[in-house]
Amino acid sequence: MSDFKWRHFQGEVILWAVRWYCRYGVSYRDLEQMMGERGVAVDHSTIYRWVQKYAPEIEKRLRWHWRRPRSTSWRVDETYVKVRGKWTYLYRAVDKLGNTVDFYLSPTRNAKAAKRFLGKALNGLKDWEKPTVINTDKAPTYAVAISELKAEGKCPKELVHRQVKYLNNVIEADHGKLKQLIRPVRGFKTLKTAYATIKGFEVMRALRKGQAAIFNLTGDIRGEARI
């Protein structure tokens, strides 16, 4: 990554800190101490700025590596994320195997937001990668969004929309694991900073699930770090 010019710390140190924060669910102050124990004196506010700048960039550059659905049966749901004391909505999709498909943070929970998320998730996929089944809860917003996307040719006409509660157990369990990373934050200040941080959390969750395993030459945590 050539974006570290004029930075006081080496790029490897910055990526090390960003990766640890996004993968292990530690607070910025705890990570400051962990870095200090390894001989790197850096303030927690500096680590915060690194995460805001580089977590979205890491997600962007690694997206091609991990965002390839292994199943055409998707589970779609949203979970709550607090921003400035108010709830926002993190739309998420995984396939039936639990692999992350995509995510989108929205200030609203309605058909427009659902459509924007599903359009984002479908964008760039080959025809054979697009879902044949999408399972959601019984919120009417998803039915509206899927119907509109079909009418616009952005969603397969033959796609089946299911609303079977137990089928979404896999994504509800995945929400819980993501929340373990979000919990130490104790509330985001803005939607922008929340989304930037969540991008880091989501890409590290995807890597941890083995979604880029084909690029992990050693098959272990060191190989994951090299990606």
Segments predicted by a language model, with ranges:
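Mobile genetic element proteins and their domesticated derivatives, centered on retroelements
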Residues: 17, 31, 47, 76-77, ...
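Acidic/histidine-rich, metal-coordinating catalytic segments
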Residues: 130-144, 164-167
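Basic, short loop/linker segments at the boundary and entry of helix-turn-helix/winged-helix-like folds
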Residues: 1-23, 39-43, 48-49, 66-74, ...
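Short conserved beta-strand segments at catalytic cores or DNA/RNA-binding microdomains
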Residues: 84-100, 110, 118-122
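C-terminal domain-tail junction helix/linker
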Residues: 184, 196-204, 208-227
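Short, basic alpha-helical nucleic acid-contact segments in DNA-binding proteins
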Residues: 49-69, 150-153
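DNA-recognition alpha helix
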Residues: 27-40
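Active-site beta-loop-alpha junctions of metal-dependent nucleic acid enzymes
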Residues: 53, 103-127
